[in-house]
């Protein structure tokens, strides 16, 4: 068994080594200066937002395509966002929930962990809103005769109509897959290893419609902007009454989606993957 682990370790980290790597990474993140964490969070938020732009393009005017196939394509292209975050070394709130492994290991304090979560969360929000603003002013919502903007509206509205408990559980499922992807990337020793291993777990959560709080920091504000600031020409092109999307507002965004999804993401990442995986590898 030892020789098998040694052979594996030459091409990839063993589960125990990956857990050590996760703990070291979590410790580094928690000890980073808050301003750097915030700026790194902006970068990650922008990466995820751009990935959702890519996703939206693949879903636009796709009514004639098989539903599952369309979602699969959307999930696969969205994985680019998490790949960019990991390769660039940016900080994403959902994967930063894994800092709980360093807290459980006694290497950081609860204050350090919570501070990192808050700073990165705010940075992610700024990054997502920045891309939303740039996309809006670029006129991208008018692409494909306004169908691109209609996809944004439909996707955003769907997200705010989960029940609170549904959104919470969709958040758990999402961050189980995100943190599985990131944790598996810790085992890779090359950029190709790390990128390739994350594609399918991320594709799974997106194609299945699980909820990611940072992605929603772009998608739902983008929907709100499109619903309330689009020109009459936009609505004429898509042939839809603007009142259909009047419920896209801050209340529905924050209360009905962002809060329960964020809490679910914490449970899915910090506990279901971080603490559980550490227990599996560190206690034997």
From Swiss-Prot:
InterPro entries: Aquaporin-like (IPR023271), For/NO2_transpt (IPR000292), For/NO2_transpt_CS (IPR024002), Formate_transptr_FocA (IPR023999)
Keywords from the UniProt entry: Cell inner membrane, Cell membrane, Membrane, Transmembrane, Transmembrane helix, Transport
Record bears the keyword ATP-binding: no
GO molecular function: formate transmembrane transporter activity
Cellular compartments per GO CC: plasma membrane
Topology of the protein relative to the lipid bilayer: Multi-pass membrane protein
Gene3D superfamilies recorded: Glycerol uptake facilitator protein (1.20.1080.10)
Domain of life: Bacteria
Residue intervals on the Cytoplasmic side: 1-34, 94-116, 185-194, 274-284
Catalytic activity annotation: formate(in) = formate(out)
Entry's localization field: Cell inner membrane
UniProt record, GO biological process: formate transport
Periplasmic face residues: 56-72, 138-163, 216-252
Site (Important for formate translocation): 94, 212
Key word Cell inner membrane present: yes
Stretches that traverse the bilayer: 35-55, 73-93, 117-137, 164-184, 195-215, 253-273
Subunit structure: Homopentamer.
Functional note: Involved in the bidirectional transport of formate during mixed-acid fermentation. Functions to maintain relatively constant intracellular formate levels during growth, using different mechanisms for efflux and uptake of the anion.
Family: Belongs to the FNT transporter (TC 1.A.16) family.
Protein name (Swiss-Prot/TrEMBL): Formate channel FocA
Organism, as annotated: Haemophilus influenzae (strain ATCC 51907 / DSM 11121 / KW20 / Rd)
Gene (UniProt): focA
